[in-house]
Regions:
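Glycine-rich flexible loops
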Residues: 1-253
């Protein structure tokens, strides 16, 4: 099953594609500002509207901080570059195409190496504890991959990742980084942002050597936190775009 996208007329599809390009370019730029990317090695993608299963992704060799909306390439689920300049990184293909193919929620797939979630992935038994209000929302959405030691070099490994992710939206990949999926770019970005902040709080608390003060589990399903509304996710990315409009306006070109 491929990710669910809407079918639009050609003109509407062009407008929708450009809007997605600008949102994704903003996510690349903000990710660079926050230090989430690993030199030129990380990758983010989004399915395009239309009948054909095509996705936008960054081409190999670009820093996140330099990417513009027009730089993103269009690929199919077989890894062929259909539009744009550059090549598709093989690791990116095996992760993104397989998740897009199998997970209907995964219209957007973000794969990065943010400091605190990545550090958590390196700890034996490292998981986000129910120790901050953010976790009341996040904990039921996270899966931890403790088997993936090898680099992602084939579809078999991509399929394993997609199966393990299942209907969750966040995967902390053991000794690696994090993959977050969402129905829209802004939802995936917002969830990634919250997860990384939550990991930062926990890693900071753990560095004291003191015992974490956890929240009783009975509160988990009674409170979703202020980030349960996708409107806030849209407003969050829009706020960053206003900053970029002032300081890095070329992102949307």
């Amino acid at each position: 099953m491929t990710a669910v996208v809407k079918t639009l007329s050609d003109s509407k599809a062009d407008e929708a594609e450009w809007a997605l390009r600008c949102d994704m370019a903003a996510i690349f730029r903000v990710s660079a500002r926050l230090g989430w990317n690993e030199q030129i090695g990380n990758h983010n993608s989004v399915m395009l509207p239309g009948d054909e299963p095509l996705f936008l992704i960054n081409a190999r060799g670009y820093l996140f901080r330099e990417l513009r909306a027009s730089d993103l390439i269009v690929c199919d689920l077989d890894g062929r570059v259909l539009r744009g300049k550059g090549e598709l990184r093989k690791v990116a293909f095996h992760i993104h195409a397989r998740i897009h193919l199998t997970n209907p929620k995964a219209v957007t797939v973000l794969h990065v190496h943010p400091q605190h979630l990545t550090a958590l992935s390196m700890i034996d038994g490292g998981e986000l504890a129910l120790a901050h209000h953010n976790n009341l929302l996040l904990n039921d959405r996270i899966v931890y991959d403790t088997a993936g030691y090898e680099p992602v070099h084939d579809n078999e490994e991509g399929d394993r990742i997609a199966r393990l992710l299942g209907d969750r939206t966040i995967m902390v990949m053991g000794n690696h980084g994090v993959t977050v999926v969402g129905a829209t770019p802004h939802e995936a970005f917002d969830e990634l942002y919250i997860a990384e902040r939550t990991a930062m709080y926990q890693m900071t608390a753990m560095s004291t050597g003191m015992k974490l003060r956890t929240i009783p589990d009975r509160f988990r399903r009674n409170y979703l936190g202020p980030w349960g509304d996708t409107v806030d996710a849209r407003m969050h990315l829009d706020a960053w775009r206003r900053v970029l409009d002032r300081e890095e306006p070329d992102y949307a070109t």
